UniProtKB/Swiss-Prot annotation:
One of its GO terms (cellular component) is Ndc80 complex. One of its GO terms (biological process) is attachment of spindle microtubules to kinetochore. It is found in: Nucleus; Chromosome, Centromere, Kinetochore; Chromosome. Keywords: Cell cycle, Cell division, Centromere, Chromosome, Kinetochore, Mitosis, Nucleus. This is Kinetochore-binding protein 3. The lineage of its organism: Eukaryota, Metazoa, Ecdysozoa, Nematoda, Chromadorea. It comes from the Eukaryota.
């Protein structure tokens, strides 16, 4: 049988080995805890970045929608103004045409009522043109 001292030395050596391994386990656990903290911090930062990006995209989408709506309104307004301009141009053209026609009719009537003048060729031309207008 072994002596008590040898037996006690073996026990002490084993306790030291267990103690060293316990310290290694504790050190490993501390490292794991630091890794876990880094992972949590990274996740939180990533979530903040995602939230900020989502908020920015939402703002940009609202701005885009607003600009598209304003563009559509301006296009409709431009179309209305273009239509009004065409109508105005047609009215102005019709007024000018009516004024020319009225003056022409007055000139033709004046020539018909005045006695024959020496320039009968012009009178025939006016007569032909008045027949075209009437």
């Amino acid at each position: 049988m072994e002596s008590l001292n040898e037996y006690m030395d073996k026990i002490i050596n084993r306790l030291k080995a267990v103690n060293e391994k316990d310290e290694l386990v504790d050190e490993g656990m501390r490292k794991l805890q630091k890794c876990q903290e880094k992972i949590m911090k990274t996740r939180i930062d990533a979530q903040k970045h995602i939230d900020e990006r989502h908020e920015q995209q939402s703002f940009e989408q609202q701005l885009l929608n607003k600009n598209m709506f304003e563009t559509e309104q301006l296009e409709e307004k431009l179309k209305r103004l273009d239509d009004e301009n065409k109508i105005g141009n047609e009215r102005e053209f019709n007024k000018k045409l009516e004024a020319i026609s009225a003056k022409w009719t007055d000139d033709v009537n004046l020539l018909k009522t005045t006695p024959n003048e020496p320039n009968d060729g012009n009178r025939k031309k006016l007569s032909n043109l008045s027949n075209i207008l009437v």
